C-alpha cells in the first residue's frame, strides 16, 4: 500500500489500483504529486460525498486505462468495454471480412477456381484457409496418440463438447458425428494402438468428424449453412508413405459408383475409406458409409432452407488430405450435393500437405463433377510429391496420355498454393522432412503470405508459438520451447477414493447416428449405378 500526501489529504492506492481516502478531505482543488505517469489533477471532496468520490475514482481509472492505450467502447447490454487501439482495429477488420465473406463466399469456395485471389493473396481467402486448417488441426489436438493410454486411438473429448474442450469456443460449429476407420493392412504405420491388453477397440481409430455451422454463424458470418468434414492425418511420423503400394485401382472395385472404370485411386487410400469391421461397434460401418449417411441426413435437413444456402467443405492434412479429396469425389459422384428440390450444393476441398490420390482420369472426373480443390503445400515437404514420383502431372501431357493406363501414373487435382518456410523469419531454414510437413507451420506460413515475391508479414495476429506445439521449428531466439503441448497429468484424474485413474471416456451415443441404417438403405451402396 503506497501512501501519497497531498496537503492535508492522504490518499492510498491499493494493489487493485483503486483509491480510498484515509483522512479528512477539504473542498479545495489540489495537485497530487504522483510520478509523471500517474499525475492527475483532482478535487478534494467531503468524506461524506460518496457519489462524488466514486466519480473521481471512475475518472482516475478511466485516465489510467487511457494512458495504457485503452479506448472506451459502448457495448449494447454490456456497458462500457475497454479495448486497445489494436483490439479495435482487429475487431473492425474481422467485421469487414465477415461482411465480405457473406457477399463473396461462392468465390472464396472456388466457384471460379480462385482466379485472381491467390496472387496477391486475398485476405478473406487467407482467413478461410487458416480457419479450415484449424479445423483439421483440431483432429490432432483431440487425438490420443499415447500407446500407454488404454484409449489410444480415440478422441479425448466427447462430440458435444469437442470445440469447447479445445478452446475453440467461437468456432460457430457443432459436431454432428465422429468418424472411425478400421485398421488397414496396407497402412499399418498410420494407426495408433494401445499397449493395454484390454482396450476400447483392437481394430478401430478415430478419424475425424462431421460438423455443421450453427444459426448465428451461418447467418452473420458465413452467408450460408456449411457442412464441414475434417479428416485426421499424421502429426510427425511419415512411415505410412513407405507403406503405399503405389498401385492404382478402379474405384468401382470397392463398389464406389462411377460411369468410367478408368477412374482410379491409390489402393491404400481406397481400402482405408471403404473397409469395415462388423465385429467392432465403432468400425462396423466403413468411413465411407459414415460420411455419406451423415451428409445425406444434413442435406435433407438444410438443403432447401428458404433463408440460407448450403455448402459442403472437406478438409484434411497429410493422409487426411487424401481422404478429404476421395470423400468429396464420392459425395459428388453419389449426387448427395443435390437438395430434394434439385438445388446444387457446392463441394470444396481444402487440403494441407496432401499426397496425390488418383490418376489423370480421376482428376478429370473431379472437374466434371464440379468439385473444387485447393491444395496448400510447403515446397520443402516430401508428402505432396508422393506417390507418383516419376509419372505425374509435371510430365508432358502427351507422355501422361500414353502412360495413363499404368498403375503408377498419378496426377494432383485442383489448384496449388505453394508456400516456402524459408521465407518466414520465425522458422529455422533447415529442418527434417517431418517438420517441413507440420500443419501448424503451414498455417503460420499462410498468415504471412501476401503473394509471390512479397515480404512475409503476419496479418491476423495468430500466435507464432503454435508452430512449436508439436515440433521444434521456431528459431531459438524466440525462446518458445519445442513440443510444448501436453495433457494435464497425461489424462489421469483422481477418483472418489483418492486414487489416480484414467477417466472413462467413450460414450457410444457420440459415435453412430441411430438412423444410420435408414439412410444406408436409401443410398443402396451395394447396388451398381
Swiss-Prot record:
InterPro entries in the cross-refs: AB_hydrolase_fold (IPR029058), Fungal_lipase-type (IPR002921)
Enzyme category, top tier: hydrolase
Induction of expression: Slightly induced by wounding. Induced by wounding. Induced by cadmium and selenium in roots.
PROSITE patterns linked to this entry: LIPASE_SER
Superkingdom to which the source organism belongs: Eukaryota
Reaction catalysis annotation: 1,2-dihexadecanoyl-sn-glycero-3-phosphocholine + H2O = 2-hexadecanoyl-sn-glycero-3-phosphocholine + hexadecanoate + H(+); a 1,2-diacyl-3-O-(beta-D-galactosyl)-sn-glycerol + H2O = an acyl-3-O-(beta-D-galactosyl)-sn-glycerol + a fatty acid + H(+); a 1,2-diacyl-3-O-[alpha-D-galactosyl-(1->6)-beta-D-galactosyl]-sn-glycerol + H2O = acyl-3-O-[alpha-D-galactosyl-(1->6)-beta-D-galactosyl]-sn-glycerol + a fatty acid + H(+); a triacylglycerol + H2O = a diacylglycerol + a fatty acid + H(+)
Tissue localization of expression: Widely expressed. Highly expressed in leaves and stems.
Single biological process term from Gene Ontology: lipid catabolic process
Residues annotated as transit peptide in the record: 1-43
Translocase in keyword set: no
Pfam family membership, one: Lipase_3
Phenotype of gene-disrupted mutants: No visible phenotype under normal growth conditions.
Example GO molecular function: triacylglycerol lipase activity
UniProt keywords, alphabetically: Chloroplast, Hydrolase, Lipid degradation, Lipid metabolism, Plastid, Transit peptide
Annotated catalytic residues: 318, 381, 437
Coarse class of the protein's main subcellular location: plastid
Record's subunit section: Interacts with SBP1.
Family (UniProt): Belongs to the AB hydrolase superfamily. Lipase family.
Function: Acylhydrolase with broad specificity. Catalyzes the hydrolysis of phosphatidylcholine at the sn-1 position. Possesses moderate activity toward phosphatidylcholine (PC), monogalactosyldiacylglycerol (MGDG), digalactosyldiacylglycerol (DGDG) and triacylglycerol (TAG).
Protein name: Phospholipase A1-Igamma2, chloroplastic
Source organism of the structure: Arabidopsis thaliana
Gene: DALL3
